[in-house]
Amino acid sequence: VEKIEDGQYVLKFNILFNNGERHLSKYVGNVRQGDEFTKTTLTQDLTMETPGFGYLEYRGPSPMWNIKGVNRWSIRLYTDGIVVHPDQYWGVELNGEGEYITIELFTDSHYTTEIPEGRYVISKEEVPYHANMGQGGWGYNFGTWYYDLGDNQAPAVSGEVNVGRNGDDYTVAFQLIDDRGNTIQSDYTGPLQYWDSYNTSSA
């Protein structure tokens, strides 16, 4: 394998079959890296540009019958310039440049208008002070995901999110690991606009 330029590779094959025949071949062109199980498109560690604004979405109690006393939330952070439509399933206008991240986390059920300060650990467990790992893919993502408008995306499979608060301002600092081992990190300090999608959708 030889890389030439602009993502182009030269792949040379020299295959010996069981019957003694040898097959020689060569391919020149683009090679898509990854496999059917790896969902990140990142190829190296990334520090997200400092977000300029964000939302705190209350999503209500867990819909799982066997999980009680847990509420679901999403912290949604966007860099300046991104246009987002919360009332249209959080659609983002795909023009220009920008980055955003969705962090799904869990609290005790008595939190319905704010989230407590603390350390939230990325995992699959739906319990307070945990954040849901990035799952899904191929058009149906849920959990904690990083995106940019240049078609990059990455699920968080481990890491942590630290939440602090001073008056109306939250501090959200995250250090996440994607499914290729890349680190994704950044932090935000400022207000988070509250959005109650649970009571809106159930009204």
What residue spans do the PLM features occupy?
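Surface-exposed helix/loop patches within compact recognition domains
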Residues: 1-2, 61-164, 202-203
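Acidic, glycine-rich flexible loop segments
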Residues: 1-32, 126-200
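Extreme N-terminal export signal peptides that direct proteins to the secretory pathway
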Residues: 25, 35-76
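Short, surface-exposed linear segments at secondary-structure transitions and domain or protein termini
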Residues: 33-39, 108-117, 194-200
